[in-house]
Amino acid sequence: MKFVDEAFIDVAAGDGGNGCVSFRHEKYKEFGGPDGGDGGRGGHVFAVADPNLNTLVDFRYSRRHEAKRGEHGKGSDMFGAAGSDITLKMPVGTIISDADTGEVLFELLTPGEVITIAKGGDGGFGNMRFKSAINRAPRQKTPGWPGERRNLKLELKVLADVGLLGMPNAGKSTFIAAVSNARPKIADYPFTTLHPNLGVVRVGPEQSFVVADIPGLIEGASEGAGLGHQFLRHLQRTRLLLHVVDLAPFDEAVDPVAQAKAIVGELKKYDAGLYEKPRWLVLNKLDMVPSEERAARVKDFVKRFKWKGPVFEISALTREGCEPLVQSIFQHVHAQQLAQNAPAEVDPRFAGEPPRG
């Protein structure tokens, strides 16, 4: 499922160091020649395509990125040291454009690709550069050149890692709002979500995953009833499905187990591959169940639903149980990413041989 994630950043490469005016001071030499060194270049700003990242969420927390300026030149023919470079890690597929003009400047298409997005300024010349037969004691120097400064827009077509599956009003939108930066429309009537909502869940620095809230399914969705059919296909590219169930429906005549079975039935009818995808059961709205009844109600649901996979009990409204679920999701998604990016095993007998045409 593709969505566009975007972020705006300001980058500034380092200015070059200034040149130095200096003269040699040696014993018995009253007029030593010029020995002022050049300034060091400013630090560059690089971007590298990191296959372990899948969102731009970190750039929303740190917008400005500056490299160090170069050191000034010194006497005794000493040049200033170059300023330290900085490297920004971005997901593969990031498009970098000028935020002011909209012009596309760079695209990070291959893992490990490195590009220079802002070049550091050159260092200024020291007075030793201006010595000539006519001018034996020059006092000229030049300042360092300014580094490049850019306002950039980052765009990434994002594939959702996790899809939320469930009946209308199961609490999917509330869950995505509780754990991510998404703010879906939420109300107490079915089909509040009319379009897929994307949320980026940030677990830590450079640790995040993408969750998609799909409009609620009803029985008959695989044949195109309700809003289900056009969105079921969005779940096919996800790494994990969360089956969200309302454990305390307002209408007491509604059986959560029957609803859950209907969802699984639609999934199986629509696509066997989707049915076989890793799926976790998330029992929501625990805050609506008296604490003394919770264990019995969960046990009864799991038994009648004949469920043998992972079960998580949460209240999206109060966020109870959400943190352990988020951590488990990240570990699962990260493990799948590592497996997907692992290099293919090479038969040791043929290691180092060129590929045969």
UniProtKB/Swiss-Prot annotation:
InterPro entries hit by this protein: G_OBG (IPR031167), GTP-bd (IPR006073), GTP-bd_Obg/CgtA (IPR014100), GTP1-OBG_CS (IPR006074), GTP1_OBG_dom (IPR006169), GTP1_OBG_dom_sf (IPR036726), OBG_GTPase (IPR045086), P-loop_NTPase (IPR027417)
What are its GO biological-process terms? ribosome biogenesis
Task: Tell me the Pfam families matching this sequence.
Answer: GTP1_OBG (PF01018), MMR_HSR1 (PF01926)
Q: Which family does it belong to?
A: Belongs to the TRAFAC class OBG-HflX-like GTPase superfamily. OBG GTPase family.
State any GO CC term. cytoplasm
Q: Which Gene3D superfamilies match?
A: GTP1/OBG domain (2.70.210.12), P-loop containing nucleotide triphosphate hydrolases (3.40.50.300)
Q: Which PANTHER family match?
A: DEVELOPMENTALLY REGULATED GTP-BINDING PROTEIN-RELATED, MITOCHONDRIAL RIBOSOME-ASSOCIATED GTPASE 2
For this UniProt record, the keywords arranged alphabetically read as follows: Cytoplasm, GTP-binding, Hydrolase, Magnesium, Metal-binding, Nucleotide-binding
What EC number(s) does its UniProt record assign?
3.6.5.-
| Top enzyme category | hydrolase
Provenance organism: Acidovorax ebreus (strain TPSY)
* Taxon lineage: Bacteria, Pseudomonadati, Pseudomonadota, Betaproteobacteria, Burkholderiales
Function noted in UniProt: An essential GTPase which binds GTP, GDP and possibly (p)ppGpp with moderate affinity, with high nucleotide exchange rates and a fairly low GTP hydrolysis rate. Plays a role in control of the cell cycle, stress response, ribosome biogenesis and in those bacteria that undergo differentiation, in morphogenesis control.
Q: What is this protein called?
A: GTPase Obg
The Obg domain covers which part of the protein?
Answer: 1-159
Instruction: Tell me how this protein assembles.
Output: Monomer.
Q: Cite the GO molecular-function annotations of the record.
A: GTP binding; GTPase activity; magnesium ion binding
OBG-type G domain: which residues? 160-334
Tell me the cofactors it needs.
Mg(2+)
Task: Identify the NCBIfam families for this entry.
Answer: Obg_CgtA, PRK12296.1, PRK12297.1, PRK12299.1
Residues reported in the UniProt entry to bind Mg(2+):
173, 193
Principal location class? cytoplasm
Task: Give the location in the cell.
Answer: Cytoplasm
Q: Which residues bind GTP?
A: 166-173, 191-195, 213-216, 284-287, 315-317
